[in-house]
Structure formats: structure tokens, C-alpha cells
Amino acid sequence: MPFKETCPVEERIALFRDYDTGLFTLAELAARHGVSRETAYVWKRRRETGEARWFDDRSRAPGHCPHRTAPDQLAAILALRRRFPMFGPKKLKARLGMEHAGVPWPAASTIGDILKREGLIAAQPRRRRPVAHGEIPAGPDCLNGEWATDFKGWFRTRDGRRCDPLTLTDTASRFLIDTRIIAPTQEGVRAVLEQAFRAYGLPDAIRSDNGAPFGSTGGGGLSRLAVWWLRLGIEPRYIPPGSPQHNGRHERMHRTLKAETSKPAASDACEQQARFDTFRQRYNEERPHEALGQTTPASHWQPSGRPYPDRIEEPWYDADHQLRRVRSQGEIKWRGELVFIGEALIGEQVGIAELENGDHIVRFCTRDLGVIDHRFCFLRFAPPRARLRAAPEPAVTAQH
């Protein structure tokens, strides 16, 4: 036999219906209905007020909550969210602190609750962190100690044309130096980098993948672009193939760039470039970065103290090195034999030093290219090559 269910409202009405008969005291009825005598008297006083729905439960919420978000702060939070629809609670709180210094704003968790309540944020499943395989080298802490560059994955603008954005950042400050639509060639990349070098000076190193146009399968893994970097005193740093986590800071910026500029894509390359320019300004000057203590990259960034030279000097080698000029076919003349070094080094001067075993190591600037053995074979040092991709389509370059 099921338990008998009772309704508190019906119990209160029944209690006072019996009380009105005059046959029972309020204490007796309270005991019969399983409530305290004090509770029964509370309901008796409420009934005597003449209120129509005296038997209903009342809200137990406090009449005043000192921690409730003030209406003007609530309006400011929602207005800022409309200005920056991609900002989460932490960045909104940081941005509010920048724009209204000295004002105590709600915690980021409270701002998140406000956004959920207003339907401005959807609950998302927690993403599992990928397990890192091997050590991921951290970037330098000094400004311009390392820049990172890469092509964000290509996409098509609404007119059907292909768009290849090249991005360039300072690793330490996260400052986005440039985002430019160019052809994915050595000439296109060099033009953008030279403009950045002239405007902001030279970094100590540049991190990139080892695919074209940044790297090659030649000696030392160098491309013509990397040879130019070495002559400028910039160290090329290649991440392992298929390991984007080794350029994680740059890849994280790409995710934000994609969300804010290419979903959906612009109508043509010129409009898309305008979006990239706007994003760069907001990313550097308005968007707080959690790794920077919720400050902006622009508040940390300073140009390099190494200016772009008017004339690039020849490489310097120790006195124990013999010098050779790489010929037009990528070869050097060594002890009467032609030894192929690499087409990326055509016209460049390399240094050759003898090793203890009688072989000879070939160097260009600070990079070891490979070894010439006793058979006059050049055994080149090169990072592993990423898997081959299909030939790229003709790219669109935004005209300014």
C-alpha cells in the first residue's frame, strides 16, 4: 500500500478548519499535524491579517543582498560583451578594470553567471588536454628573443579566391607584428619580413615549421629564406614535423584569428585584409592576455634594438676554416672535385673545417650544413621532412 502524500497548503487549511470548530486547542492541532506550536501560531497571525492567500509559502530570499551586482555594473558588463563578443568572463573583467580603474568589479565567475543568465554564453563540454609527447621547448622570456611565423590554413573568400594569411608574432609578448595575405612563396614571405625588420628591428631567432618556404631538405635544412636570416644574424628554429604544440603560442593566436575574422569569410581579399588589420589592432591593444596577467601585448612590446642593416656583410669564419663560394649549380670545388651542397646556398660563402677523423664539416654562418667524407660525398644535416602536400593553387594578394 503506497504512502499517503500530503500537501503543506492543504494541511494548513485543514488545521484551521478543525480549529474553527472550537473543539481543539491550537497546541493539540499542531501536534496532530506534526508541526511545532510556534509554527502554528505564525500561521494563525498571518491568517488574522485577512490576506487572501495566507496559507501560501513566502519567498525566503533576503530583502537586500549586499553582493548583488549593481544595475549600472550589469549594464556595463553587457555593453562590453556586445563590443567584444569573443571575450570570456576573465577578459571582460580585465578589460573593465582597464576602462574603469579603481572600480571593484564582480568576480569572473559572477560575470560568467551573468552571461549565462542573459543567454550570451552557452555551456561547453570541458575539453580534454592533449598529452604532450616529449618535451615542448618554451619560448624565450625576452622581447624579440624569438619571433614566430606561419601560414594560417588557407581558405576561400566569398568570391571563390584562395586566401593565404601569413602571421608573425613576438613569442615573449604575444605581440602580433603582422597578418598579411600573400602568395605562399619565398619572395612573398621575404617582402613581409623585410618590411617588419625595417619597422621593428631584427629578432634573435625565428621559429617556423620546416616546410617551404621556411625550410628545405638541403644542407642544414636551409631554404633561401633561412639563408637570408642567417646572414642577418637570425637563427632559424624549426619545429618537428607534425608537432604544432612546439609553436603553441602562435597556433593559439591562429585559433582566435580564425574565429574573429574568417567565420564567415569576407567578400574578397581586400575586405579580408581589412579584417586582419582591425583584428591586429584589437588583439594587441584591447584584448587582455591571461599569460600576461590579463594585460595587453602592446603594453609589453618594444621594437628590437638591432636595426635592419643597409648592407649585409659576408659571413665570418675562424682562421682554421677554408672558404668556398657555392657555384650556380649548388656545388663547391673541393680538392679537385665538385661537391653538391645545396641550391639554397648558391652564391654564398661557406667555411670548411677538418674533423679529427679526417672528414670535413661544412658551415654557413653559425649553421652546420653537413660533412664531406673521404669519398667526397656530402652527408647533409637536415631536419626530417614533413609529408608532401598537393601543389598549392595560385594565391591572391591584397592590393593596397
Where are the regions that the model predicts?
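Charged alpha-helix within mobile-element recombinases
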Residues: G218, R224-P309, G351, L355-E356
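Basic, flexible linker segments flanking DNA-binding modules
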Residues: R45, A52-A148, W154, A212, ...
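Mobile genetic element proteins and their domesticated derivatives, centered on retroelements
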Residues: L15, L29, A40, E51, ...
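Acidic/histidine-rich, metal-coordinating catalytic segments
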Residues: P184, F197-G218, P240-G242, N247, ...
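Short, Lys/Arg-enriched anionic-surface-contact patches
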Residues: M1-A14, G63-P71
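Short, amphipathic alpha-helical "recognition" segments used to contact nucleic acids or chromatin
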Residues: C7-F24, L74-R83
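C-terminal, beta-rich DNA-binding module of retroviral/retroelements integrases
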Residues: N284-H400
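Mobile-element integrase/transposase regions
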Residues: R68, D72, S109, L115-F175, ...
